[in-house]
């Protein structure tokens, strides 16, 4: 790769980022990481009514949670002068022309075209307006919106994901670049920014393929270098529905608050719909090494929350204490007990936050379940003296087995119910020393402790 790549992720701060946004953000950031390039975070905040500072701040925070730290950052709202200059250049070249139709007029025109079996594309009627007609519209209070005059030709490129691709621009309406109120739609600011900062690779969802035909012509009209384009498959719900910011439970913020690990979200967002086996990858560098745009599937990539649960659990089961000690402390686990507790319970966790329930089992209060009072009373008499250690459980259960003849489930389940109040959980050989003799005695006696 000749030049050091510069890629970008450009969300609109009109809602919280969701798992579908994470895919292009990660593909870009990991591509830059692998190729020794840079990553630009650009806020496309030209929608003045819907863009908010809350969502802008949240976007940066959520990307940081995923491990994405931009090398460059800017907002489009700070760069209007650049867009104004580009728009004037296009007007002077005859590529940006004023139109005065109302939305209702355009809708009626589209319906007439469809009724005649014609494609519903803009007919360029505004190009035939005389100066007098334009003046009359403006005297009537109409302000023009501005369309980019497309060359009616095929735009072709070698897509980084899809291979040889093309768009026949003769089948497209001339796109509106400037609204009647003077604000800009997505297309012109995006091209101006990419050209001005030198974006080399535009990696985005396949829903932008048609936009690429338009944008290539815009780059050329502005005498700017055309970047390489790659259009990846989109994440959908498990049912095949498109993801949107309205799906709050799949927002990155909600996933973080629900206790998912960023590595699990990263791995699933990137590897789903690729040639790689979907598996948890903790290291960003390792995950970056697996990003091969040419091997992404053309089929939609289905995001299944159940798969995320499994991925998260696999990560948690392998986590060392160093990765979780602060979170355990926040749950009330003292430093001196943290290692033994974590090693005891992590294989039973789906999320680190689930450890809170097991700390309560250890620390109490627990209401015991005494399913077999006589058996538990005999077992209590055989409970070893303090201090408890790794061999205490085996020594105790061997003694109980010899005394009562109980074995297997008949031996272990009544003891588990009495000590934890539950019929499942971590290995009691590891839990019993954490519970301690005093609590064990009280629970075996049927007391809440």
Swiss-Prot record:
Main location: cytoplasm
InterPro entries found in the cross-reference section: aa-tRNA-synth_I_cd-bd (IPR045462), aa-tRNA-synth_I_codon-bd_sub2 (IPR020751), aa-tRNA-synth_I_CS (IPR001412), aa_tRNA-synth_I_cd-bd_sf (IPR008925), Glu-tRNA-ligase_bac/mito (IPR004527), Glu/Gln-tRNA-synth (IPR000924), Glu/Gln-tRNA-synth_Ib_cat-dom (IPR020058), GluQ/Sye (IPR049940)
Record motif 'HIGH' region, residues: 11-21
Positions contributing to ATP binding: 245
The keyword Protein biosynthesis is assigned to this record: yes
Localization (cell): Cytoplasm
GO molecular function terms noted in the UniProt entry: ATP binding; glutamate-tRNA ligase activity; tRNA binding
EC number: 6.1.1.17
Signal sequence segment: none
Top-level division of the source organism's lineage: Bacteria
Motif ('KMSKS' region): 242-246
Cystine residue pairs: none
HAMAP family: Glu_tRNA_synth_type1
Subunit structure: Monomer.
Function, in words: Catalyzes the attachment of glutamate to tRNA(Glu) in a two-step reaction: glutamate is first activated by ATP to form Glu-AMP and then transferred to the acceptor end of tRNA(Glu).
Protein name in the entry: Glutamate--tRNA ligase 2
Annotated source species: Methylorubrum extorquens (strain PA1) (Methylobacterium extorquens)
């Amino acid at each position: 790769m000749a030049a050091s790549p510069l890629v970008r992720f450009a969300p609109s701060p009109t809602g919280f980022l969701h798992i579908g946004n994470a895919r292009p953000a990660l593909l870009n950031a990991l591509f830059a990481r692998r190729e020794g390039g840079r990553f630009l975070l650009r806020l496309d905040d030209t929608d003045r009514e819907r863009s908010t500072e809350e969502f802008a701040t949240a976007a940066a925070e959520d990307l940081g949670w995923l491990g994405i730290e931009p090398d460059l950052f800017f907002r489009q709202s700070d760069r209007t002068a650049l867009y104004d200059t580009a728009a004037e250049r296009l007007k002077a070249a005859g590529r940006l022309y004023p139109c005065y139709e109302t939305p209702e007029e355009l809708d009626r025109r589209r319906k007439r075209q469809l009724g005649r079996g014609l494609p519903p594309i803009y007919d360029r009627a505004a190009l035939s307006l005389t100066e007098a007609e334009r003046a009359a519209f403006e005297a009537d209070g109409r302000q023009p919106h501005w369309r980019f005059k497309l060359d009616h030709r095929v735009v072709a490129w070698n897509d980084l994901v899809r291979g040889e691709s093309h768009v026949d621009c003769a089948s497209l309406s001339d796109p509106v670049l400037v609204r009647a109120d003077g604000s800009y739609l997505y297309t012109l600011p995006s091209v101006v920014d990419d050209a001005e900062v030198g974006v080399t690779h535009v990696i985005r969802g396949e829903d932008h393929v048609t936009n690429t035909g338009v944008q290539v012509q815009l780059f050329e009209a502005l005498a700017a270098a055309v970047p390489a384009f790659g259009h990846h498959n989109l994440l959908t719900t498990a049912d095949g529905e498109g993801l949107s910011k309205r799906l709050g439970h799949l927002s990155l913020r909600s996933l973080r608050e629900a206790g998912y690990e960023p590595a699990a979200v990263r791995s699933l967002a990137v590897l789903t719909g690729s040639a790689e086996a979907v598996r948890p990858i903790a290291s960003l560098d390792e995950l970056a090494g697996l990003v091969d745009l040419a091997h992404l599937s053309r089929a939609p990539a289905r995001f299944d929350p159940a798969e995320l649960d499994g991925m998260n659990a696999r990560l948690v089961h392998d986590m060392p204490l160093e990765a979780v000690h602060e979170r355990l402390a926040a749950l009330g686990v003292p430093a001196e007990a943290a290692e033994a507790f974590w090693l005891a319970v992590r294989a039973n966790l789906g999320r680190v936050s689930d450890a809170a329930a097991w700390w309560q089992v250890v620390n109490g209060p627990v209401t015991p379940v005494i399913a077999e009072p006589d058996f538990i009373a005999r077992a209590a008499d055989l409970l070893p003296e303090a201090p408890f250690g790794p061999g205490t459980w085996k020594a105790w259960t061997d003694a109980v087995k010899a005394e009562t003849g109980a074995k297997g489930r008949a031996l272990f389940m009544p003891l588990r119910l009495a000590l934890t109040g539950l019929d499942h959980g971590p290995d009691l050989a590891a839990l019993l020393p954490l519970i301690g003799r005093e609590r064990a005695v009280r629970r075996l006696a049927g007391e809440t402790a």
